[in-house]
Every structure is written in structure tokens, then in C-alpha cells.
């Protein structure tokens, strides 16, 4: 009888261990998440505090993050760290693709509280690229994210002003700058959106930014935003 009791106890312990492991995997899946986001049109997010720590990697296109009064261009191949609680707004230009790893505040790791560009290790870059082709909620994704979690703890974020960053910060509607027509168009339409949100009427926006050409304004809105403003 004692032997049977011991066997039952060992079986119980084994099942409890498996259950705990499965629970841990489930927690990890929700505490660390990977997203492969594609933006066919201009996407302008409202300014808000980050609820999670996030690592952004621009694959295609361009992302622009505003911290305080300064904007920073995140170009293809660059990585940017956004700590939890960071007040920022993000703009994703049309046809952009961005990888993002989110880390919940429930994790007790010592994540950097400084926002900025980071230089990923070869391992971290390989992990992020592998995650883009890995099934969501799979055991492999959980394993990869666990290693990513440890890798990001070694990052040292720093803010830097690239030539493109300086250009975007100096840009004003109608100014004569060395800037691509595509970027100038996107910034102009972003300004139009800002004016509308501040209560400006359509006629005033068209007169200020599009020389009174309403038809051109409406066509460009559908082209860049995918809808009318």
C-alpha cells in the first residue's frame, strides 16, 4: 500500500510540474509578444504613455517617433527602444513594415528607462528575424522570446540626430528644403490632419497647404490615408 501511495505521489508531483510549466509558458506568451506590423497607408498614433517596454525594428519604409518637441526618424535596419511610461507619438509612413517586441511591466527585469536607438547584437537581430517566420503562440516562439528578453537587458539606448531626423524637424509646409517629394507630401498631409484635429475647417486647410486645390487635396488624402480626412 505504501508503494502504491508513493507511486501516486510521484505521479501527482509530475502532473503538477507539467501544469506549472504550461502555466509559465502561457504567462510568457502574454508577457512578451512579437508583432509583424504592415502599414499600407500613413498611420499617425496619438501622443500617449507607453503601457509596455517595446523594441521597434523598421524593416521597410520609415517610422518617426516624437519625444518632447523633437522627432527622430527610424530608418530601415535601425532599432529603437521605447520604455514603459515614455510619452511619445509614432508616425508610420505608407508601405512601412515594422517588427515590434513588447515586454509587459509584470516582468521584474531591469529594463532600460531611456528611450533611444540601440545597436542589436548579431544574436538579437537573428532572433527578431526568426520570429517573423515563427507561428504565434508556438513553443518555438516562446523559446525565442525568452532569449530576446535576456538580450534586450544588455542594450544601451541613445538618442541621435541623423541627417533625415534634422530635416524632418526643420521642415515646415511650403519650405524649400532638400527633401524627397514623397516625404514632403506625407509631412504635408500629416500637417493637414493636425490642423483638422485642432478644429480648422477644410477650406482653410486646402488654402493653407494646397493652394486652394480641393480636388488635389481629396485625391491625396485617399492616396496617403486610404480615406478622406
Indicate where each model-derived feature is located.
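Short alpha-helical "recognition helix" segments of helix-turn-helix
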Residues: 202-209
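A short, Lys/Arg-enriched amphipathic alpha-helix from helix-turn-helix/homeodomain DNA-binding modules
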Residues: 164-200, 222, 226-227
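Short beta-strand segments in beta-sandwich/barrel cores
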Residues: 54, 60-66, 79-80, 88
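Short acidic-glycine-tyrosine-enriched beta hairpin
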Residues: 69-81
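…primarily DNA-binding HTH/wHTH and HhH modules…
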Residues: 6, 18-19, 218-229
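Generic protein-terminus/edge-of-domain signal
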Residues: 1-62
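An amphipathic alpha-helical interaction segment
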Residues: 120-176
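Ligand-binding loop in jelly-roll beta-barrel domains
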Residues: 86-117
Amino acid at each position: 500500500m505504501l508503494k502504491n501511495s508513493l507511486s501516486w505521489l510521484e505521479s501527482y508531483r509530475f502532473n503538477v510540474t507539467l501544469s506549472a510549466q504550461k502555466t509559465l509558458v502561457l504567462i510568457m506568451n502574454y508577457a512578451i509578444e512579437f508583432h509583424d506590423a504592415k502599414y499600407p497607408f500613413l498611420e499617425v498614433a496619438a501622443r500617449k504613455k507607453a503601457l509596455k517596454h517595446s523594441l521597434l525594428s523598421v524593416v521597410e519604409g520609415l517610422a518617426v517617433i516624437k519625444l518632447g518637441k523633437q522627432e527622430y526618424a527610424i530608418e530601415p535596419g535601425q532599432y529603437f527602444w521605447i520604455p514603459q511610461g515614455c510619452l511619445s507619438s509614432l508616425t508610420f509612413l505608407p508601405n512601412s513594415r515594422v517588427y515590434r517586441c513588447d515586454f509587459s511591466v509584470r516582468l521584474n527585469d531591469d529594463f532600460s528607462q531611456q528611450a533611444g536607438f540601440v545597436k542589436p547584437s548579431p544574436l538579437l537581430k537573428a532572433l527578431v528575424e526568426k520570429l517573423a517566420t515563427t507561428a504565434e503562440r508556438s513553443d518555438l516562439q516562446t523559446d525565442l522570446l525568452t532569449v530576446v528578453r535576456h538580450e534586450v537587458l544588455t542594450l544601451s539606448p541613445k538618442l541621435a540626430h541623423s541627417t533625415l531626423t534634422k530635416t524632418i524637424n526643420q521642415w515646415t509646409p511650403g519650405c524649400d528644403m532638400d527633401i524627397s517629394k514623397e516625404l514632403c507630401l506625407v509631412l504635408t498631409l500629416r500637417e493637414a490632419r493636425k490642423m483638422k484635429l485642432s478644429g480648422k475647417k477644410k477650406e482653410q486647410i486646402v488654402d493653407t497647404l494646397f493652394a486652394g486645390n480641393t480636388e488635389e487635396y481629396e485625391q491625396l488624402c485617399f492616396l496617403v490615408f486610404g480615406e478622406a480626412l
